[in-house]
């Protein structure tokens, strides 16, 4: 006859629940116990033909799809999208501007014609400030002086 210690209850079989628990642990959590980790590591191969599980592929795709950024980078990107980059206006960029070139050439030609035709009179040409602000804005100090006198 069998002794009570030798009886095997199918529900209390020490090997099968442990295997089921290990499989459930692999499926449910990403954190593995050291014993389970050793068993899983033994199953690994260097064969590239081994197919990866769909779960791991989906996790990898989700990780790759979401860019890593912190809060400050997100705020900076939102601000930059609201205000697009504009070029800085410098003296060189003004000199390269084709419309500004045409204006300068016309002004130079008019001045040369007046000088050649002896049309130059001292009071005919008003004072022009040569600073960059007046040059860029086409600001006429004589007009502003007249406004101040009123």
Curated annotation (Swiss-Prot):
Q: Which UniProt keywords apply?
A: Chromatin regulator, Cytoplasm, Developmental protein, Nucleus
Quote any Pfam family the record assigns: PGC7_Stella
Q: Does the keyword Thylakoid apply?
A: no
Give the residue ranges for region: Required for H3K9me2-binding: 1-75
| Spans annotated as Required to exclude TET3 from the maternal pronucleus | 76-150
Q: What happens when the gene is disrupted?
A: Null mutation result in apparently normal offspring. No effect on early gonadal PGCs or gross abnormalities in the development of gametes. However, females display severely reduced fertility despite ovulation of normal numbers of oocytes. Null mutation resulted in preimplantation development failure. Embryos rarely reached the blastocyst stage.
Query: Which cell locations does it reside in?
Result: Nucleus; Cytoplasm
Listed GO biological process terms: embryonic cleavage; epigenetic programing of female pronucleus
What protein is this chain from? Developmental pluripotency-associated protein 3
Record the organism.
Mus musculus
């Amino acid at each position: 006859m069998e002794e009570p210690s030798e009886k095997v209850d199918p529900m209390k079989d020490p090997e099968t629940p442990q295997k089921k628990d290990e499989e459930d642990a692999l499926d449910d959590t990403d954190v593995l116990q050291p014993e389970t980790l050793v068993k899983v590591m033994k199953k690994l191969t260097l064969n590239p033909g081994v197919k990866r599980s769909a779960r791991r592929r989906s996790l990898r795709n989700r990780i790759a799809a979401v860019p890593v950024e912190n809060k400050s980078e997100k705020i900076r990107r939102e601000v930059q999208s609201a205000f697009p980059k504009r070029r800085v206006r410098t003296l060189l960029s003004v000199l390269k501007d084709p419309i500004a070139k045409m204006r300068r050439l016309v002004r130079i030609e008019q001045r040369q014609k007046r000088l050649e035709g002896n049309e130059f009179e001292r009071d005919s040409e008003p004072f022009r400030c040569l600073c960059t602000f007046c040059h860029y804005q086409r600001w006429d100090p004589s007009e502003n002086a007249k406004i101040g006198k009123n």
